[in-house]
Amino acid sequence: MNVHKTRRQFLKQSAEAAALLAVAPMGSMYLSAAEPEAVWKAGIAKAVITPEKAVWLAGYGSKRPPDGKLHDLWMKALALEDATGKRVVLITSDFQGVPKGMSDLVFEQLQMQFRLERQQVMLTFSHNHCGPRLGDDLVDYYPVEAEQVELVAEYTAQMVTKLVAMVGEALANLAPAKLQIGEGKATFAVNRRNNKEAEVPALLAAGTPLTGPVDHTVPVMAVTRPNGDMAAILFGYACHPTTLS
């Protein structure tokens, strides 16, 4: 039976399996060190996913093509393998999300090429509201002309190929590593259902408490090599990040 985990559960359980021992304070964040005898391997890969053509952007209030580039968009993969050889892969990308048709193709290819089952792979997204549209995602929200339909389909196919290849690279890069988990705090997330956006800056400046539930915790996983070099830092945050308007 497939068991679907949340991102927080994935981060927590992946590192807790190493039988954590010590907790070292680090300001508002702590890291728990993994048991020395635990054998972990980690592999990392990344790829630029900035479109080379003017693919419609997803997440704006109206359909919109790109008008320039502030910086590249990225897709990254972290592969983990425990002492028994069990593998999991976490993939993050600068998309708003991916449609089911695309994710089905990705999972099919990962199973065929690397024998990764669905429960061994997690897709996460920066959900930046200014990345390219994929497949039939938001097709009812962003009706576009035939030329754009073709561009989006072409770009989506490229991303499936690039994502699968990137996972293969991460698996090929598996090497001994130490995992540590911790938790920090960041307070910029605001409950927008209970606080009017225009009033938030003044309320914060006045020290007036905002209302409504929020989650300001930042779960963190640090991946280091045996020589102490930092290989990767993985974190998550509960916030709806509309970065551009």
Regions found by a protein language model. Give the residues of each.
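Short linear sequence motifs
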Residues: N2-V3, V23, Q148
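Twin-arginine (Tat) signal peptide motif
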Residues: V3-L11
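N-terminal export signals
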Residues: L11-L31
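Conserved beta-alpha junction segments in alpha/beta enzyme cores
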Residues: E35-T124, N128-S245
